[in-house]
Amino acid sequence: FFLWVRHNVPNKVDLQWLKMGGGIVKKGVHPPAKKFNAGQKIIFWAVMIGGLSVSMSGIALMFPFQTTMFADTFAMLNTVGFNLPTNLTPLQEQQYNQIWHGFVSLVLIIMIMAHIYIGSVGMEGALDAMNSGHVDRNWAKEHHSLWVEEEDQKAAKPAE
């Protein structure tokens, strides 16, 4: 986790990448990206946050009627202007847990399936990169131009 966070912090370049649809909308036009593009960052954070959320709701489902996760969450949300019920019965807590667990899981499954498709057969060169662990320099320039520039600058610095 800690090795990847610094590369997955959103920045202004990601907004441009999203506006251009990641290069999927127009053939041959790839927006600039660093080591990870906005789509990869979205997947990273969805898996980190969604995975934690599904794990927590799963634990609550494994040990029914032991937690008040939603009543507590609703109370926090009410402090910023929401008007959600906080006096939930244990049965209501379980119902919210089931709905949340199923919904977040479904969203993650859909996102991961799309990620697998795009990262394998949906993008030319992606499968080769996954198999070898390396990307062609021209592919990297086309899809992650800012990252290539950063790496070139690192390589150009003289050793001290």
List each language-model region with its residue ranges.
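Membrane-embedded alpha-helical bundles that constitute the cytochrome b-like, heme-associated redox core
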Residues: 1-160
